[in-house]
């Protein structure tokens, strides 16, 4: 039986929370500087790749890709955690619509794991290889628009866990 990639999953759940809040949907990314595409059927990019990161995200798959309003989205991912991630870890999320900042918020990574019942996972997150799978609902009311999302996770000591980014589009109906 495989373990879940807890840190990655928390970041993906922030993506899910943003979807549920109606601020993001389809990724249509032009890669920002210092990024690399994440393998799989996902338009996510790992950002801040010149900095040491405690998680290597190997693959992310979204089904359907791109996500569809009013339908379930299955998120599958795998990767590796290199160092223990403990209570106090956090995620900074920023969502922009063009030059307008819609959201700039910090979330507790461990609380995010618990609140979303991610296969019963909780901190501390031990080093190792992990696979995850989660199904989330995308509301039909998501407004059209083009958004840029950046999520950076840090340890309680402010070491970079990982960074995810993507440009997101919900077309008009």
Curated annotation (Swiss-Prot):
SMART domains noted in UniProt: ML (SM00737)
Keyword hit for Membrane: no
Any GO molecular function: phosphatidylcholine binding
Hydrolase in keyword set: no
InterPro entries in UniProt: GM2-AP_sf, Ig_E-set, ML_dom, ML_PG-PI_TP, NPC2-like
BP terms from Gene Ontology: intracellular sterol transport; sterol transport
General function of this protein: Catalyzes the intermembrane transfer of phosphatidylglycerol and phosphatidylinositol.
Additional facts recorded: Present with 2836 molecules/cell in log phase SD medium.
Designated name of the protein: Phosphatidylglycerol/phosphatidylinositol transfer protein
Record lineage: Eukaryota, Fungi, Dikarya, Ascomycota, Saccharomycotina
């Amino acid at each position: 039986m495989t373990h879940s990639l807890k840190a990655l999953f928390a970041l993906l759940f922030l993506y899910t929370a943003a979807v549920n809040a109606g601020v993001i949907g389809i990724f249509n990314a032009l890669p920002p500087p210092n990024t690399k595409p994440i393998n799989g059927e996902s338009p996510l990019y790992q950002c801040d790749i010149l900095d040491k990161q405690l998680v290597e995200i190997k693959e992310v798959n979204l089904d359907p890709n791109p996500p569809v309003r009013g339908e379930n989205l299955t998120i599958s991912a795998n990767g590796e955690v290199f160092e223990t991630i403990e209570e106090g870890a956090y995620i900074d999320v920023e969502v922009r619509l063009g030059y307008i900042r819609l959201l700039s918020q910090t979330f507790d990574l461990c609380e995010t794991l618990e609140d979303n019942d991610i296969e019963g996972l909780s901190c501390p997150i031990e080093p190792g290889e992990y696979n995850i799978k989660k199904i989330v609902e995308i509301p039909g009311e998501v407004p059209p628009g083009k958004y840029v999302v950046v999520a950076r996770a840090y340890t309680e000591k402010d070491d970079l866990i990982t960074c995810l980014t993507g440009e997101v589009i919900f077309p008009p109906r």
